[in-house]
């Protein structure tokens, strides 16, 4: 093929169809950059290359027979040599055409790839940034941030209200049980509740009992809870030190109040940082990864509380609830009882109920004999098949929803896997069992066994449905922890399901392996600890005075173990600035909003290379200026010269001039302020300038603009999600109010059966001497002088149900009064607290209750 030489730079455009097919679909940002012509690559100059190619081909004698454009001949028909096999070198020409077409595509792909890489890295010039800004709508991002913050505050407030209602329901339930146990009158309980509400309202109006925080206290608590939120090592250590009876309330304070119930990148990053440290500490105290399953450790409790937040609840409601409802709850005749003995006993009972005669079946058969009976087998076999069928649906739903599993749960499992592999050199199956335990048993299983408690179903479950769910949960638990049922205890009846379990284990192993394939939180959430300095609004938490007091006391009690070795530990400094913890009781407990403030912000600023307080302001100003000035053009030859880059100061000076020329004083003012801010940041060492170029700063601006659309979309979704969350919370609040009404109705029904027979009978004050109370063990200690014991008497009366007024008299002179609450006594007795300390006297709780029961309660 003499005369045919293909130069390396030649590119061919075959015809109009080929041209359109070879054009790559570059993303919008890349297209905008290409159209502007401001790029550091010369790959995009395709038109000139194509002209060069056609000239080259004609010079080499390839003009004949290669008509690129179609044209009509003298007869009006379209003539093209493209498909004319009789033309010279037809096959060779087709090969060459294909090669050149491939080269066009390759060049376009390289061009797109390089521009995408430049976009991801933010390596754009000012003109390209302006081109991107022109494609974006100018909006006020801050307004959305403020709205989202307000929605979050409202949501947290609603969550707190719901929790208070739930506590009221639980307290009411407990009081009913205790009062019935002590033969209390239900009518008095209702009267006491009404009086308690009035008393509480009255006490709330009493300024002497209203707890207020002075400005210094408020600021210290703002600093304290910011420190706890952003420095996770304190809480990670504290959760291992507190008592078991304090754990649940404290974890609620941490996960619900301090980090919020809903998902947001900042709070999620912080809470996962807490998990990172807590998991590391927990696993440093055990000998193998499997010990996490065998011991009642802190991390499983943390995970349970964490998974009950909004994101975990939504997953369970969307994935698990439909399977539950369709296959178990709405199947009233479904019975998955696989215990052969129980099945046999049910057979006998049903036979006797149907016939009205005692069954002839032998009630004394051994288990091995029962399981061999054909009648029993005929019942068990279809139940096993049905159980497998339902388990298969749950299994499929769980496996196929991996990508919808909350990121935080997956990352926590990844941490466990990583530390287990590093610390213990654990085998893959051992780690898989641990991951399966946390994902299934500590998350999904709880919702399957008690869906009503997790609020993923509104229907009440029958006893049979609950038993069915327990059996289903057992099968899935063994499957996800890679175990089979053994021939012992209650497990022997589940052994027929082992074959199905074994058939799925390879899929489970792959699922658990895929589950931990997630990126680090800083990459996934696009958050790191330095983002704190760029927050446009300070974080806000809604917290009760009781929670503040509890946390304060726990920190003081464990400060020695919590503080760092440095002389000036931040936590210790804040605690020293605070007075003693608040004395909070139910009557004066209330919620406040804490705007969290970083007292030690300057310490973080020293660690980073950008002064974020000026950075956030300056970025917004630069974007505003770039929108208002003409697009900055670059000479083509400058794009290849690394020494010649954008002179940001010159651009800003031109902006000042442009503002004056166009009568836009705001533009000039903004540009001047940017120049001043740049000089300040440079003086602080936050940014560097080479010949007024500020290349690093321009890159920061580019990344801000490139990601702005995505950020806005995330905010839009978050706003919508928070609105829906608020609606659901208010629905649940309505449900709780209905539940309280149900309790009230129940109390009224009980009243019909347990009301006093003699409504006119009244309780007169009871007189009892000091010596008699001491003899009966009611009085344990007293500050009353011994000489006065003989002449001291107590008069006990009850004008209000559950409230006992005690007046002390020496002779006929009254020397003081006090009140005893039946609720307080019953609570202390239930909690095992032996003594009640009052002013000048200490009472034995149980002996006091006995006295009141004997002389008052039976007559109420």
UniProtKB/Swiss-Prot annotation:
Disruption phenotype annotation: Cells initiate cleavage furrow formation but rarely complete cytokinesis. They grow as giant and multinucleate cells both on a substratum and in suspension culture with increased cell mass but development remains unaffected. Mutants lacking both rgaA and gapA are extremely large, flat and multinucleate, and exhibit cytokinesis defects similar to that seen with simultaneous loss of ctxA and ctxB.
Pfam families documented for this protein: RasGAP, RasGAP_C
Coiled coil: 146-185, 663-732
Domain Ras-GAP: 269-515
Gene3D superfamilies from the UniProt entry: GTPase Activation - p120gap, domain 1
Keyword terms: Cell cycle, Cell division, Coiled coil
InterPro entries: RasGAP_C, RasGAP_dom, Rho_GTPase_activation_prot
UniProt biased composition (Acidic residues): 1-20
Keyword Cell cycle annotated: yes
GO molecular function, one term: actin filament binding
Statement: the UniProt record of this protein carries the keyword Acetylation: no
Gene Ontology BP terms: chemotaxis to cAMP; detection of mechanical stimulus; hyperosmotic response; mitotic actomyosin contractile ring assembly actin filament organization; mitotic cytokinesis; negative regulation of actin filament polymerization; protein localization to cleavage furrow; regulation of actin cytoskeleton organization
Region: Disordered, residue numbers: 1-48
Induction remarks: Rapidly up-regulated by hyperosmotic stress, which is dependent on dstC. Strongly inducible by 8-bromo-cGMP and to a lesser extent by 8-bromo-cAMP. Not induced by DIF (differentiation-inducing factor- a chlorinated hexaphenone).
SMART domains for the chain: RasGAP
Gene Ontology CC: cell cortex; cell trailing edge; cleavage furrow; cytosol; filopodium; lamellipodium
Subunit (UniProt): Heterotetramer. Quaternary complex with activated rac1A, ctxA and ctxB in the absence of rgaA.
Known function: Part of signaling pathway that is required for completion of cytokinesis. gapA and rgaA control cortexillin localization to the cleavage furrow and hence may be involved in cleavage of the midbody in the final stage of cytokinesis by regulating the actin cytoskeleton. Forms a complex by linking activated rac1A to ctxA in the absence of rgaA. Assembly of this complex is necessary for the recruitment of cortexillin to the midzone of the dividing cell.
Protein name as catalogued: Ras GTPase-activating-like protein gapA
Species assigned in the record: Dictyostelium discoideum (Social amoeba)
Upper taxonomic lineage: Eukaryota, Amoebozoa, Evosea, Eumycetozoa, Dictyostelia
């Amino acid at each position: 093929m003499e005369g045919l030489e293909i130069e390396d730079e030649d590119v061919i455009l075959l015809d109009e169809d080929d041209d359109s097919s070879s054009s790559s679909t570059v993303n919008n940002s890349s297209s905008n950059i290409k159209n502007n012509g401001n790029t550091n690559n010369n790959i995009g100059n395709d038109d000139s290359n194509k002209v060069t190619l056609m000239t080259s081909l004609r010079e080499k004698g390839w003009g004949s027979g290669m008509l690129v454009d179609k044209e009509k001949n003298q007869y009006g028909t379209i003539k093209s040599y493209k498909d004319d096999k009789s033309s010279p070198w037809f096959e060779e020409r087709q090969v060459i055409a294909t090669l050149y077409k491939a080269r066009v595509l390759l060049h376009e792909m390289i061009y797109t790839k390089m521009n995408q890489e430049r976009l991801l890295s933010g390596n754009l010039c000012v003109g390209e940034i302006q081109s991107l800004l022109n494609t974006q709508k100018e909006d006020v991002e801050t307004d959305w941030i403020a709205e989202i913050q307000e929605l979050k505050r409202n949501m947290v407030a609603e969550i707190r209200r719901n929790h208070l209602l739930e506590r009221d329901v639980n307290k009411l339930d407990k009081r009913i049980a205790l009062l019935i146990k002590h033969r209390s009158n239900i009518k008095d309980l209702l009267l006491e509740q009404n009086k308690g509400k009035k008393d509480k309202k009255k006490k709330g109006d009493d300024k002497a009992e209203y707890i207020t925080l002075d400005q210094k206290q408020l600021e210290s608590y703002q600093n304290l809870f910011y420190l706890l939120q952003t420095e996770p090592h304190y809480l990670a250590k504290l959760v291992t030190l507190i008592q078991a009876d304090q754990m649940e309330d404290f974890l609620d304070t941490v996960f619900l109040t301090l980090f919020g119930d809903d998902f947001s990148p900042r709070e999620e990053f912080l809470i996962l940082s807490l998990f990172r440290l807590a998991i590391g500490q927990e696993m440093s105290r055990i000998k193998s990864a499997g010990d996490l399953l065998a011991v009642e450790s802190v991390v499983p409790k943390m995970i349970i509380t964490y998974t009950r937040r909004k994101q975990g609840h939504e997953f369970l409601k969307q994935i698990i609830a439909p399977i539950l409802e369709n296959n178990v709850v709405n199947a009233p005749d479904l019975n998955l009882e696989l215990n052969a003995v129980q099945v046999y006993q049910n057979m006998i009972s049903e036979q006797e109920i149907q016939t009205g005669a005692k069954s002839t079946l032998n009630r004394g058969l051994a288990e091995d004999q029962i399981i061999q009976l054909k009648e029993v087998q005929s019942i068990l076999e279809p139940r096993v098949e049905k159980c497998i069928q339902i388990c298969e649906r749950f299994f499929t739903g769980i496996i196929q929803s991996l990508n919808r599993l909350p990121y935080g749960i997956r990352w926590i499992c990844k941490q466990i896997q990583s530390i287990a592999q590093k610390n213990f050199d654990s085998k893959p199956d051992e780690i898989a069992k641990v991951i399966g335990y946390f994902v299934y048993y500590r998350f999904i299983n709880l919702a399957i066994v008690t869906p009503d408690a997790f609020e993923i179903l509104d229907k009440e479950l029958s006893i049979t449905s609950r038993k069915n769910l327990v059996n289903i949960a057992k099968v899935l638990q063994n499957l996800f922890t890679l175990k089979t049922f053994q021939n012992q205890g209650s497990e022997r009846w589940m052994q027929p399901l082992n074959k199905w379990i074994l058939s799925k284990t390879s899929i489970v192993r792959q699922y658990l392996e895929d589950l931990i394939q997630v990126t680090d939180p800083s990459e996934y959430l696009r958050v790191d600890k330095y983002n704190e300095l760029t927050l446009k609004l300070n974080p806000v938490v809604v917290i009760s005075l009781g929670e503040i007091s509890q946390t304060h006391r726990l920190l003081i009690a464990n400060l020695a173990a919590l503080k760092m070795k440095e002389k000036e530990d931040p936590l210790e400094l804040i605690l020293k600035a605070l007075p003693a913890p608040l004395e909070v009781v139910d009557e004066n407990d209330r919620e406040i909003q804490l705007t969290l403030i970083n007292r030690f912000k300057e310490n973080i600023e020293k660690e980073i290379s950008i002064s974020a307080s000026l950075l956030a302001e300056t970025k917004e100003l630069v974007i505003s200026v770039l929108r208002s000035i003409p697009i900055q053009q670059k000479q083509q030859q400058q794009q290849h010269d690394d020494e010649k880059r954008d002179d940001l100061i010159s651009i800003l000076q031109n902006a000042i001039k442009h503002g004056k020329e166009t009568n836009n004083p705001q533009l000039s003012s903004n540009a001047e302020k940017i120049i001043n801010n740049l000089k300040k940041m440079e003086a602080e060492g936050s940014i560097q300038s080479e010949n007024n170029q500020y290349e690093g700063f321009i890159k920061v601006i580019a990344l801000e603009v490139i990601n702005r659309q995505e950020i806005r979309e995330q905010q839009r979704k978050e706003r919508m999600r928070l609105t829906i969350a608020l609606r659901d919370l208010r629905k649940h609040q309505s449900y709780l109010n209905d539940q309280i009404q149900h309790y009230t109705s129940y109390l009224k029904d009980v009243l019909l059966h347990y009301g006093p027979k003699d409504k006119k009978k009244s309780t007169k004050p009871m007189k009892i001497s000091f010596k008699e109370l001491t003899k009966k063990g009611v009085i344990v200690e007293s500050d009353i002088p011994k000489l006065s014991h003989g002449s001291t008497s107590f008069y006990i009366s009850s004008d209000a149900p559950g409230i006992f007024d005690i007046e002390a008299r020496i002779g006929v002179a009254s020397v003081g009064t006090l009140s005893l609450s039946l609720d307080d006594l019953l609570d202390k007795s239930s909690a095992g607290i032996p003594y009640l300390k009052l002013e000048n006297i200490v009472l034995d709780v149980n002996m006091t209750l006995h006295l009141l029961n004997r002389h008052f309660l039976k007559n109420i």
